[in-house]
Amino acid sequence: MEGVRFVVWRLGFLVFVWFFDISSATLSPTGVNYEVTALVAVKNELNDPYKVLENWDVNSVDPCSWRMVSCTDGYVSSLDLPSQSLSGTLSPRIGNLTYLQSVVLQNNAITGPIPETIGRLEKLQSLDLSNNSFTGEIPASLGELKNLNYLRLNNNSLIGTCPESLSKIEGLTLVDISYNNLSGSLPKVSARTFKVIGNALICGPKAVSNCSAVPEPLTLPQDGPDESGTRTNGHHVALAFAASFSAAFFVFFTSGMFLWWRYRRNKQIFFDVNEQYDPEVSLGHLKRYTFKELRSATNHFNSKNILGRGGYGIVYKGHLNDGTLVAVKRLKDCNIAGGEVQFQTEVETISLALHRNLLRLRGFCSSNQERILVYPYMPNGSVASRLKDNIRGEPALDWSRRKKIAVGTARGLVYLHEQCDPKIIHRDVKAANILLDEDFEAVVGDFGLAKLLDHRDSHVTTAVRGTVGHIAPEYLSTGQSSEKTDVFGFGILLLELITGQKALDFGRSAHQKGVMLDWVKKLHQEGKLKQLIDKDLNDKFDRVELEEIVQVALLCTQFNPSHRPKMSEVMKMLEGDGLAERWEATQNGTGEHQPPPLPPGMVSSSPRVRYYSDYIQESSLVVEAIELSGPR
């Protein structure tokens, strides 16, 4: 008996020690969380006009609940602060956040040098400091970041040379140092995409370029006494003209040679036509798979491995030879306009859209008969599958997770709309296209299959791609899409998160009539929001947050697209900034009150309230419903 007690006591002691070790892993000997200290130091050196860092509290013991901070296994793994109007400098204490995998600070006004201490972040995979006002040289310590895939330092005021140490990083996919004041030669980096445009004094890789090719200052003989009168003056003028012409010719010649070199080099960013079927050719971190590999991984595309069906194709679960689980999307239409080159160009665009809340492309397969995309497998499926299709017995998403999903999705869409080049319109934002990673972080899928948007143009199509109930009225009536089309779809997604229902399935029960959006508007006007709530939540929700999220959803789904907020504004409203003012303005008549214009060719005999269901019934365009049958 004593022996049993001793064993039980010892096991209990070991469990206690293990728990204590885990809970105090980020604590200093004085009991202070060093990650909290580092983040607060970062906050203190930044000017934060919109108070986005307000809840970064030095007295907190857990930074994982802070805005713009994400954690993995209890450690800070991501710092995402894009487009927050931040200024000031970046604290060297950021180097103490040694579990960081992603730092995104683009589109702010941060000044000063890039801290050398960033070189300590050995787990860092993505560093984006673009579109700020950083000065000084690029730290050589960045070469110590062995896991770095993406480095964006473009559009700053950096000087000096690009450090040779970057050549030591073998896994680089993208390096962008364009539009700075850099000079000298470039290191031979492994990145498939290396952007240097906008640095007038950069002279190319050491292996192929001669940095001494800058012309020496032209020296003319000093003027002496005028012995030949006008003839001598004419001679001087001719000499000056010839010298000027020679200098101009040299500049044009040098510029032409540089542009030719850039053109030749940029062609190598993608595949050479003669190599387009070479299975060994890859694009940065992307792998080019053979059809045989993917057929084997999916057991000959067995129907038992189908994860979902959509308008673009079928998604299969796959097991690669190394045991890795992947999602294999076999596209329906192999005859993409532009053929192989156009497909590869779109693959490149997808691969360069990198954000924690976007589904990362792992690889692809391309041949005359097949177009296949390979993505990481998401073990927690889609939001749609988690809301209703709990076949595997998983619990329903609780309220806090649903709000986290809303914010994460908004961040992903902000990146697509405002930080990608070219911008990308998703055109089918819905719960089935929002996937969940192992931490239940929202990951926007299928974005790369939408049409790309040039900065100057909106996309017009004669066939509307999307899911009924999610398609914006102007898209239904005219075929014209814009970023505001996605804002509308996001508003419907918020309603799906609240109700636990798919917009496409809404109206099948006896007490539901019309479409989801019209029903929500009616209940909101009647003050009966509680009827909206998903019964699986068992009344465990925040009533104030419910009201706020419904308001955001209604702002997003206004019929007039010009009245809808931008996704960056939506994100701020979800985080508690500016919603009250925007909602009040709408209610006071400065927002949308009048009925939207009717679709072309329709005449209204009398003013009346327009409902979303009217647009669905009246649309003469082809609607290709995209609906997945299961988690992806």
From Swiss-Prot:
Kindly state the tissue distribution recorded for this protein. Expressed in seedlings, leaves and flowers.
- Residue ranges that the UniProt entry lists as topological domain Extracellular: 26-238
Which Gene3D superfamilies does its entry note? Phosphorylase Kinase, domain 1, Ribonuclease Inhibitor, Transferase(Phosphotransferase) domain 1
- Tell me the ranges covered by the Protein kinase domain, including all copies: 301-584
Q: Which SUPFAM superfamilies match?
A: L domain-like, Protein kinase-like (PK-like)
Q: Which residues carry this modification: Phosphoserine?
A: S382, S385, S477, S482
Main subcellular location: membrane
| Residues that bear Phosphothreonine | T298, T324, T461, T462, T467, T478, T557
- SMART domains, per this entry? S_TKc
For membrane topology, the record states: Single-pass type I membrane protein
Single annotated GO MF = protein serine/threonine kinase activity
Chain positions covered by the region annotation Interaction with geminivirus NSP protein: 415-495
Residues recorded with modification Phosphotyrosine = Y475
Q: What does this protein do?
A: Involved in defense response to geminivirus infection.
Q: What is this protein called?
A: Protein NSP-INTERACTING KINASE 3
Q: Which organism is it from?
A: Arabidopsis thaliana
| Native organism taxonomy | Eukaryota, Viridiplantae, Streptophyta, Embryophyta, Tracheophyta
Gene that encodes the chain: NIK3
